[in-house]
Amino acid sequence: MKLAVLGVCVSLWACAAAAGPGDALDEVMHSLAQRRHGEVSFVEQQFLSLLKRPVESYGELIYDAPNRLEKRTIEPRAETLVVDGETVTVQRGRRSHTLDLKAYPQLLPFVESIRATLAGDRAALERLFRLEFTGSEVRWTLDLRPLDAELAKTVADIRIEGSRDELSRVEIRQPDGDRSLMTLRAHSGR
């Protein structure tokens, strides 16, 4: 009898442990979904095999739920990239170029990795990636690995780190070893 009770306890503990990360991911996604607007500053470093030093840029990211994301690069040269629904607009100086995201499906995973995470849209992430979540709501890491074999030729994985409803780092690794690392910081006075 004691063995049966012990077996049930071990089984329940194993189920709880297995459900834990999923529950924490659901909590994080729920927290993220509650945030309707956010502004952070960013520093992005691109580590390219052709260069001895990383290429660094900085600026700010602005998010308006559920599907508007704006990246304003200040240095090394001013550039604004706006994703609004299915439209992507890039502006450099007086020149502006707009394209339909549907016409460039290879861009969708990059956009959705951040936009769907900020929106707390787990289903959108799961359509494109295999999700691995570690941590708790207080401090978490979400690894995204492409489900599509063609995409996997371009992106090895995307790692997003955060705390509660805030992202702190986004790292995109390519199969050839090149990678970009974006560090995010809340604006002061927030």
State where each predicted segment sits.
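Sec-dependent signal peptide recognition
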Residues: K2-V8
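Short hydrophobic/aromatic-rich beta-strand segments that constitute the beta-sheet cores
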Residues: F42, L69-T73, V88-V90, L142-L144, ...
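Short beta-strands and strand-coil junctions in structured, solvent-facing domains, enriched
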Residues: S49-L50, R77-E79, A149-L151, L167
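N-terminal signal peptide c-region/cleavage motif recognized by signal peptidases
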Residues: S11-A16
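Amphipathic hydrophobic-ligand
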Residues: R53-G59, D157, D178
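An acidic-aromatic
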Residues: E60-E112, S180
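Gly/Pro-enriched, hydrophobic low-complexity segments
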Residues: R122-L128, G135-R190
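Flexible, processing/modification-adjacent segments and terminal tails
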Residues: G20-L48, K52-P54, R92-L147, T154
